[in-house]
Amino acid sequence: MKHPFSRLFSFGEKEQEEAGGKQEREEVRNIPVASIIPNRFQPRTVFDEEKIAELALTIRTHGIIQPIVVRECDNGQFEIIAGERRWRAVQKLGWTEIPAIIKNLNDKETASVALIENLQREELTPIEEAMAYARLIELHDLTQEALAQRLGKGQSTIANKLRLLKLPQEVQEALLQRAITERHARALIALKDKEKQLKLLQEIIDKQLNVKQTEDRVLKMLEAGERKPKPKRKAFSRDMRIAVNTIRQSLSMVENSGVSVHSEEEEFDDYYQITIRIAKK
């Protein structure tokens, strides 16, 4: 029997056999709270303690309506697959046991379930959501378009989230802590220069700039950069042209012999760089 997420992220026959070879009865068992460990693939890195406390009060009044889902580890512990907030809440209540369903999932499936479950709840920060998308793409070797189709989202939504991961770590941390909004962060992407991005990040936080003010500041910084005269690069000397052309001709000869060669050329102020990669097979 396929697990629910396999309809979204199809696994090979071997993986299906490993995951479903043992017929699992979804039997609810009470397992010790102390023997449970968090999901190492959990995309959520920040838990709102106030909301956990509210959940604890609800559980105290109504009990656990939906059991958590875990998998058994080799050392006798249980790793959470879904329900970490409930587990944290009962810890606050001092419970010694919690109702759980034990699943037989491998690492890839466990990671997928954790990522998808959290994405469906729509409580992740933008940066956590971006990291979840990136992890799913890596796990299942998907394109952005394929991931978007499986999750029922627009490809531009996935692309915009993933661009956030190109921002400096300090900006990502500000997003994670909700010190800035996603629209603030997306405005910073246009600057490209890390130093400028961090400078404006600090200004956003210190002056509590709204999105419109941030976008205006970005525009001014870009315009100021365009006005600065670019230093003239040194012209190619005759010897330099001969050297570069000789290398290009040599690479063509190697490629014609059937060897796979990839080269990249880049011009700098003081030198011209040619990077060559030759496949081993």
UniProtKB/Swiss-Prot annotation:
Record's GO cellular component terms: chromosome; cytoplasm; nucleoid
Keywords: Cell cycle, Cell division, Cytoplasm, DNA-binding, Septation
Positions of the UniProt region annotated as Disordered: 1-26
Residues in the DNA-binding region annotation: 145-164
UniProt cross-references to Gene3D superfamilies, sorted A to Z: 1.10.10.2830, 3.90.1530.30
UniProt biased composition (Basic and acidic residues): 12-26
GO biological process: chromosome segregation; division septum assembly; positive regulation of sporulation resulting in formation of a cellular spore
GO molecular function: DNA binding
Pfam family, one: HTH_ParB
KW DNA repair (keyword) present: no
SUPFAM superfamilies according to UniProt: KorB DNA-binding domain-like, ParB/Sulfiredoxin
Compartment list: Cytoplasm, Nucleoid
Family per similarity comment: Belongs to the ParB family.
Function noted in UniProt: Effects nucleoid occlusion by binding relatively nonspecifically to DNA and preventing the assembly of the division machinery in the vicinity of the nucleoid, especially under conditions that disturb the cell cycle. It helps to coordinate cell division and chromosome segregation by preventing the formation of the Z ring through the nucleoid, which would cause chromosome breakage.
Protein name: Nucleoid occlusion protein
Organism of origin: Geobacillus thermodenitrificans (strain NG80-2)
Protein encoded by which gene: noc
